[in-house]
Amino acid sequence: MAKTQSPLQWLATTIIRGYQLLISPMLGPRCRFNPTCSHYAIEAIRLHGFVKGCWFAAKRILRCHPLHPGGEDPVPNKKHRCDK
């Protein structure tokens, strides 16, 4: 069963998809990570919710610069309160 998105999650993922479809092709490949920062952001928002997902995405975007080596960086799994 698919998880229902909140309106903020829908808005954020729609804006990111717009960037992927309209702006990113003009800029060319720039991201140092796999998955790309925009795909990471969408996955983080879907998995962790709007606030925490945007926080993960912002931290990731701040790491995406020429001085960082990049590489594999998947979205962290969602931790439950009972997990330690």
UniProtKB/Swiss-Prot annotation:
It is a peripheral membrane protein. The keyword Cell inner membrane applies. Its main location: membrane. It comes from the Bacteria. It is found in: Cell inner membrane. InterPro entries: Membr_insert_effic_factor_YidD. Keywords: Cell inner membrane, Cell membrane, Membrane. One of its GO terms (cellular component) is plasma membrane. Could be involved in insertion of integral membrane proteins into the membrane. PANTHER family: MEMBRANE PROTEIN INSERTION EFFICIENCY FACTOR-RELATED. NCBIfam families: membrane protein insertion efficiency factor YidD (TIGR00278). Belongs to the UPF0161 family. This is Putative membrane protein insertion efficiency factor. It comes from Shewanella halifaxensis (strain HAW-EB4).
